[in-house]
Amino acid sequence: MKPQFRNTVERMYRDTFFYNFNNRPILSRRNTVWLCYEVKTRGPSMPTWDAKIFRGQVYSKAKYHPEMRFLHWFRKWRQLHRDQEYEVTWYVSWSPCTGCANSVATFLAEDPKVTLTIFVARLYYFWKPDYQEALRVLCQKRGSPHATMKIMNYNEFQHCWNKFVRGRREPFEPWENLPKHYTLLHATLGELLRHLMDPGTFTSNFYNKPWVSGQHETYLCYKVERLHNGTWVPLNQHRGFLRNQAPDIHGFPKGRHAELCFLDLIPFWKLDGQQYRVTCFTSWSPCFSCAQEMAKFISNNEHVSLCIFAARIYDDQGRCQEGLRTLHRDGAKIAMMNYSEFEYCWDTFVDRQGRPFQPWDGLDEHSQDLSGRLRAILQNQGN
C-alpha cells in the first residue's frame, strides 16, 4: 500500500526533528526518512529557489523513498529549466539506501549542470558491503559527476532547525553527545568513502623538525590488522585518519584530542575476540592524559596490541614523559616515524595523485635525534 504522505511539507514539528535527526549512530524504530532540501541557482548571489521537505518509509518500495520522490519532482521541473545550473543541498535523517544511491548517481551523470551536497544525520546500514559500495559510487570524485556527502554537525542541525522546524521560539539546543556522535560518524564515513588527506596538510603537520611552533592540531592515521594463521591480515575497512576536535562552545567546550576521538571509534568496530593489531601514525606523541587513556584501553583489551609511530614528541618534559612510560610499560610499542613510515602514510592516506613521497631536508637526522630522545624517556624509569 502506498504510504499516506503528502509529497512535500514546508516545516516539521520540533519533536519530530529531535526524534528523527538525533545523530546517535545506532538507533531503532526510526523508519521514516526525512529529507530537507534547498535548491539554489548557481551564481555569485546564489538565491534559494526552493526549500521544502520530502519524507518516506525506509521499508516501503524504493519509489516512495524521499530521495526518489525528490528526483521524480526535480526531473519533471528540469524539463522547463534545462539551461540553468543549480546547486542542490539535502539534509537527511538517514544516508541513502543502495537503490537510491545508485539512482542519484545515475541522475547526476545524466545532468552535469546539477551539483548535489548531502548532509546526513546517520549512516544507514554502513556495515554492509553493498551499501558501502553504493555510497562510494555516488561520491566518487574522478571520472564522472558525483555527490559530496558529509555528516551533519552542529551548524547543519542549527540550520535545519531555523529553516525547516515550525513554531520555534527558542534557539537550537543540541542533545547529549551530539559532538561525540558526529566524530564517530565522520570517521566512519571517511573509512567508507576512503577519504584521503591533502598533500599540504600531511607535509605541514607531519614535518618532523623536533621543535616547531604554531602546530596546534594533531593528525592520527590508523590501520587495523587481524592475526590469521600466523600472518597479520590488513582490515582495509578500518583504515583512515582523523584529527583533534578544536574547542567549540557548541561541541567539545575544551576540545578533544585525536587519540581520545580514536578511542571513541574503536568500540564502534565491534572487534571480536581474535587477535588484532592497531597501528597509529601521529603528528605528535600523546599527551599525559591521552597516554593514560590508551594504556587503560590496552590493559582492558588484551586481544588488541597497539603500535604508535609519532612524527614529533609532544612536550617531552614532566608528566608527558610519565604518560609515555606508562603506555610503554602497559604493552604499547612506541617509536618515532622514520622514512619508511612517512612514505607508507603518504602512499596510504594522502591524495598524492601518483606522486611519490619526497622527503624534506633533515628528515632522517630529525628522526634519529627524536628516536634517541624517546629511548631516553622510556628508559628513565626512575623519573
Swiss-Prot record:
Region described as Interaction with DNA: 213-215, 312-319
Record-level Gene Ontology MF annotations: cytidine deaminase activity; RNA binding; zinc ion binding
Main location: cytoplasm
EC number: 3.5.4.38
Keywords: Antiviral defense, Cytoplasm, Hydrolase, Immunity, Innate immunity, Metal-binding, Nucleus, Phosphoprotein, Repeat, Zinc
Residue span of region Essential for cytoplasmic localization: 1-60
One term under GO cellular component: P-body
Phosphothreonine found at: T32, T218
Chain positions covered by the region annotation Necessary for homooligomerization: 209-335
Compartments reported by the entry: Cytoplasm; Nucleus; Cytoplasm, P-body
Chain residues that bind Zn(2+) 2: H257, C287, C290
Gene Ontology biological process terms in this record: cytidine deamination; cytidine to uridine editing; defense response to virus; DNA cytosine deamination; innate immune response; negative regulation of single stranded viral RNA replication via double stranded DNA intermediate; transposable element silencing
Site (Interaction with DNA): N244
Alphabetical list of Gene3D superfamilies matching this protein: Cytidine Deaminase, domain 2
Known catalytic reactions: a 2'-deoxycytidine in single-stranded DNA + H2O + H(+) = a 2'-deoxyuridine in single-stranded DNA + NH4(+)
Cofactor(s) listed in the protein's UniProt record: Zn(2+)
Function: DNA deaminase (cytidine deaminase) which acts as an inhibitor of retrovirus replication and retrotransposon mobility. After the penetration of retroviral nucleocapsids into target cells of infection and the initiation of reverse transcription, it can induce the conversion of cytosine to uracil in the minus-sense single-strand viral DNA, leading to G-to-A hypermutations in the subsequent plus-strand viral DNA.
Membership in a protein family: Belongs to the cytidine and deoxycytidylate deaminase family.
Complex formation: Homodimer.
Protein name per the record: DNA dC->dU-editing enzyme APOBEC-3G
Organism expressing this protein natively: Papio anubis (Olive baboon)
Gene name of this polypeptide: APOBEC3G
